[in-house]
Amino acid sequence: MDLSTLKPVAGSRKSSTRKARGFSAGKGKTAGRGQKGQKAREGKKLRLSFEGGQMPLMRRMPKRGFNNISRKEYAIVNLDQLNKFDDGTTVSASSLKEAGIIKKELSGVKVLASGKLNKKITIHAAKASQAAQDSIKEAGSKIILTTETADSEN
């Protein structure tokens, strides 16, 4: 026995159909393409979205909205995630990234009020919800909003 003499089991491999090789092959003359028409000709095939000259679906649908080039996206941090830091720590976007709480700094950090803050820390953030600001003050912590439009300290 030799690797060069191995053959597949009889009936396990089906031979490919030889198209357009005479009527005795079973796929002669039109080679399974039907009669005349664009799809019976050789060359480039039609794209999937082609609808025979009818106005395509994607062009029939109305355009809507636009992409705002000055859109700001904030990294979201919840209050319960801030319990990871020790008392007296100053928490900023870079320290949140080092701690693995956020992946990217984006346009800044936004603090939301999910959970409860148990530590006394100073938080530097671009934005914070009103409920989050109230919870932070209630816990004895401090939040400093670092955007131009916000007050320098709340």
Swiss-Prot record:
* PROSITE patterns (UniProt xref): RIBOSOMAL_L15
User: What keywords would UniProt list here?
Assistant: Ribonucleoprotein, Ribosomal protein, RNA-binding, rRNA-binding
Q: Which InterPro entries match?
A: Ribosomal_uL15, Ribosomal_uL15/eL18, Ribosomal_uL15/eL18_sf, Ribosomal_uL15_bac-type, Ribosomal_uL15_CS
Instruction: Give me the ranges of the annotated region Disordered.
Output: 1-61
* Domain of life, per lineage: Bacteria
Q: Which GO terms describe its molecular function?
A: rRNA binding; structural constituent of ribosome
Keyword DNA repair included in the entry's annotation? no
Gene Ontology BP annotations: translation
Whether Ubl conjugation counts among this entry's keywords is no
What is a single cellular component term in the Gene Ontology annotation? cytosolic large ribosomal subunit
PANTHER family per the record? 50S RIBOSOMAL PROTEIN L15, LARGE RIBOSOMAL SUBUNIT PROTEIN UL15M
On assembly, the entry states: Part of the 50S ribosomal subunit.
Which family is annotated? Belongs to the universal ribosomal protein uL15 family.
What this chain does, per the entry, is described as: Binds to the 23S rRNA.
- Protein name as it appears in the record: Large ribosomal subunit protein uL15
Q: Source species, please?
A: Oenococcus oeni (strain ATCC BAA-331 / PSU-1)
